[in-house]
Amino acid sequence: MTGKFSAYAIALACVTGAAPALAQEGIVTDAGQQADRGQVIATFYYSNSTRGYDADGNTIDIADYEKVELFLLAEYAIAPDFTLLFKPSFRSVSVEGGDDDRGLGYTDIGGRYRFAGDQDGWLAAEATVRIPGVSRDDNLAQVGSTDAEYDLRLRGFRNLTFGSDTGFVDAQASYRLRAGDPPNEFHADLTLGYRPDPDFLLMAQSLNTISDGAGRGIFDEYRYHNVQLSGVYTVAPAVALQLGVMGTLGGENALRERGMFGGVWVSF
């Protein structure tokens, strides 16, 4: 399919795609932060797309797509190696030629078990249930919050040193089971962090989603590869502010998003 009509279907399908990921997955920025019992990260995202990728990975004109999202990630360690995860989200989605969608997005509830390593490097397994939010049956653009999802994730973290500076690498891979018509998904995410100053952290993130084949109905197989670049500045002993940009570098049957985000990190 070509043209704006088929691209509109791409936009509808991509409402079910991944929200911005790794900034919401409980990034550990250094070994010292691991000593805290918990953290809360509130992140605001704005993105838009006037172009998309067809089934061959070529860029095409699509119906204008605009998205505003708010994520609230809460983590709390109930044991040295086990952390509870809770992440509600709110969204506003607008697709040219369709109705706007506003309301509660997915809410993730789960846990992370660290089965190997220490404060400087570890391996962990995560499992989360994603509970759908507000949806409307009369509008395909609302299918993004219609059915439950189940994410099974393997995660590795390692502190790094660069002379007198510090950093970290955080690698994650997951398989996401999705009820309903959309296909299941593979996820591969990588974050590199560099701290040139004790109060300032630079992060580069690669976020990759590949469908496990095609789903039913409008859901063809798809993939998309996003990057995020951001800085996090500590303004108080337990409070930091984040500001960054994001974009889609490539994909198939996907949006080409461009946007920005900001967040507040609080540890306790």
Language-model segments: which ranges?
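Cleavable N-terminal export/targeting peptides
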Residues: 1-28, 32
